[in-house]
Amino acid sequence: MKLSELRFGVTRRIAPGSHGPAEVQSKLYALGVFPGVPVTVLREAPFGDPLQVRVGPALLSIRRCDAEHIRVEASA
């Protein structure tokens, strides 16, 4: 399942090897988005982009196109 498909308020762990192209992967790693870290989609901005997510203890805004590259495990 992709992070962009996750329902609001549901917490899942980021799946290994799920960050797409190297440039996207390095950007997400810099934000603390690593495999095994819990992630929750909290809300979305008007028109659906970006998404506000909790990654571990941090709150981030992630563009929906970047969230398409983040795979999450089926259950927490």
List each language-model region with its residue ranges.
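Short, conserved secondary-structure segments in the cores of folded domains
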Residues: 2, 27-30, 41-43
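C-terminal structural segments of small proteins and small subunits
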Residues: 3-4, 20-21, 45-76
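Short, acidic/hydrophobic/Gly-rich beta-strand patch recurrent on exposed beta strands
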Residues: 14-16, 32, 52-54
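Short alpha-helix capping/helix-loop boundary micro-motifs
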Residues: 21-27
